Every structure is written in C-alpha cells, then in structure tokens.
Design a protein with these regions (language model features):
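A nucleotide-sugar donor-handling region in carbohydrate enzymes
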Residues: 126-193
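C-terminal amphipathic helix plus adjacent low-complexity
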Residues: 305-333
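Active-site and donor-binding regions of nucleotide-sugar-utilizing enzymes
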Residues: 5-21, 35-140
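Catalytic donor nucleotide-activated moiety binding site of glycosyltransferases and closely related
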Residues: 36, 45-58, 180, 202-232
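A donor-sugar binding/catalytic signature common to diverse glycosyltransferases
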Residues: 85-96, 106-108, 241-278
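Donor nucleotide-activated moiety binding/catalytic core segment of transferases
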Residues: 71-76, 217-255
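Catalytic binding pocket for nucleotide-activated donors in carbohydrate/polymer assembly enzymes
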Residues: 261-307
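Short internal beta-strands
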Residues: 29-35, 126-128, 211-215
Length: 333
C-alpha cells in the first residue's frame, strides 16, 4: 500500500518516526511536511525524506484559515497517489483524502481543541485510553466503531525502545541543569492576552544552570544577560534532554509528559484554563506539577526527585498501537 503521512509540527515527527520505520518494511511511504519550529531538522535527524508544503502563519486567525486552505490546495496538487492517509489532528489530511475518496486515520490526544471537519471527514480515529471520546461521538456523529483506543499516552510510542545517548552531555557546557521551554503564545488554544512567565522563571532560577529551548527566534532575547543560560545552536534529541535534565519545565504538555514517562520531574506552566485529559491523569499520578506561579515552581524544583521510568510499559503500548494500525490497514488491502 501507499501510505501518506502529513507532518506539521515537531511532536508529530517523534510520534510518526517509529511508525514509519515499522510500516516502510512492507509499504511505500509518502511524507509531506510543513516548515515550522524544529519539524524539518528533526525529519532530517530521523532520515525521513519529505515533500515540503506550507509554513506556520503566526497568531492571526485569518492567516491561519487562509494558510490552511492554501496548503490543502497545494497538497491536492502535489501529493502522489496514496491508499490511506495518516495525520495528527487531521486538519490537512482529511479534506485531501475525502476529495480523493481515500480513507484517513487521525491520531490525537487533544480533547479540548476539536477540529470539526476532521471528525466529519475522517475514517478512523486513534486515541489514548485517557481521552473524552464520548464527546466526539455526541458532538460530531462519529461512530464508536471508528474509534480505536490504546492503553497509554502518545509519548509512549516514541519512548519505546529508547536508549539514552551516552555522549549527549558533550553538547552542553555544564554537568547538571534544568530545562525551560516557553509557552506557545502563537497557538490557537492560548488566550490572546497571555504573557510568558519565562523571564520571571529566569529570575528565580538565576543560580541554576538552564538549558533554554526557545520556540521562536525572538524568544532568545529573554536569555540576554544571563551567564547561566545555554541556548543550543543545533537541534537536540528531545528524549535525551528529558532523560538527562534534572527537571523539565515547559509551557505546553508534550515535553512534560515525555519527561514524566522517563521518570524525570516535570513542570507544566501551560497558560490555558482547560487541560487535556492526559495531563490531568499525569497530575493526579504526581508525575507532572502544574503551576504558573514562579515561586511555587521554584519550591517544587528545589525538592523534586526522580520517579520510576515507564519505559517497559511504553514498549507494550507501542506494540498495542502497531496492532491497531495493522488492523486498520487490513480493512483496505
């Protein structure tokens, strides 16, 4: 079969890389990618060839909508013939697949930001067990038979079989550090009047070595004047960052969940008022600390200790997901 993967954001690369590695043994793989954040460098890191289509359009809702329409048009013109599509969120893959009358598979763990057309046009939906799928059935008319659940988190998929790089610390100028990744202030799910707390975090952690991973070029300015802050000049392995850092502090959820599954203390200073179900579960288990108060965060980090790694369970989750994917592909062979 010809399987088309569309990759539009950095976490998508990590999630799809092991799946592509498995499926390419028996299938032809087509990959399209959007130029955003570290998406393209990571595809190169994993050795995945891609067709470049589109770029990020910033915070403007109008530009996002027009950009989506233009990219869908470009995909219709540029994507070779395929038998089934795989996408995260499905905003781009479902219209193209529907137009070409091909099935689509949508992966997501986001149960607070719903993409109407993805659920109306999608064929199969693959969710983690901790997902409010009843709402999808009620609000969008998705059938229960279209929904496939795996008993884990999406981060389990690419942490399966992970082995720490023994030379990773050669990339850094210090032996012990915490990591800070800013909020994604340009994302739709972040309130427009949100201000970053990263400068405040830098102040309270002024005596701690910090690996700073800015999302956008302009965020580098936050670190000016601090000798304890290091910004890498190349893309680092996110998994190794999460493993070796003393604590992971992030303005979103993915890095926090990755770190938590590796046993690393994690802090989310996500600015939204509503959290994903997967993040609520992480908080309930004590794996992720959620706060936007710099002093509270400082006290948590000061006393934080490593937890047990979940890697053995992650391997089981990955195998479970592969069975789900193979069962879907068998329908269309």
């Amino acid at each position: 079969m010809n399987i088309w993967f569309d990759i539009t954001n950095t976490p998508h690369v990590h999630f799809f890389a092991p799946i592509i590695g498995h499926l390419k043994q028996e299938h032809e793989i087509i990959v399209t990618a959007r130029d955003f954040s570290e998406t393209l460098p990571l595809l190169k890191f994993y050795g995945i060839d891609y067709i470049l289509t589109g770029s990020h359009k910033g915070k403007s809702r109008f530009k996002k909508i027009t950009g989506l329409a233009v990219r869908i048009r470009d995909l219709l013109n540029r994507v070779p013939e395929f038998d089934i599509s795989f996408g995260i969120g499905g905003q781009n893959t479902t219209p193209v697949s529907a137009w070409r009358r091909k099935p689509s598979v949508i992966f997501t763990d986001n149960d607070i930001s719903y993409k109407w057309h993805s659920y109306k046009l999608g064929s199969h939906f693959v969710f983690p067990f901790y997902f409010d799928y009843e709402r999808v059935i009620k609000n969008f008319g998705v059938k229960r038979s279209q929904i496939h659940l795996y008993n884990g988190f999406k981060e389990d998929i690419y942490l399966a079989n992970y082995t720490p790089d023994p030379n990773f610390m050669d990339n850094l100028p210090f032996k012990e550090f915490i990591t800070i990744r800013p909020e994604n202030l340009k994302a739709n799910y972040v309130p427009e009047d949100t201000e970053t707390i990263v400068p405040e975090l830098f102040k309270v952690f002024k005596d701690v070595n910090i690996l700073f991973l800015p999302r956008y070029e302009e965020e580098r300015a936050y670190a000016e004047g601090y000798k304890n802050i290091f910004i890498p000049d190349k893309v680092l392995s996110g998994k190794d960052v999460c493993y070796y850092t003393k604590v992971m502090l992030t303005g979103a959820g993915t890095f926090a969940r990755e770190a938590a599954l590796l046993g690393t203390p994690a802090v989310s200073f996500f600015p939204g008022k509503t959290f994903l179900t997967v993040d609520k579960i992480m908080q309930e288990r004590g794996w992720v600390f959620i706060s936007r108060n710099p002093e509270e965060i400082f006290q948590y980090v000061k006393n934080a200790k490593r937890n047990d790694s979940q890697l053995e369970r992650s391997n089981q989750v990955f195998q479970e997901l592969l069975k789900i994917i193979n069962s879907i592909l068998d329908i269309y062979k």
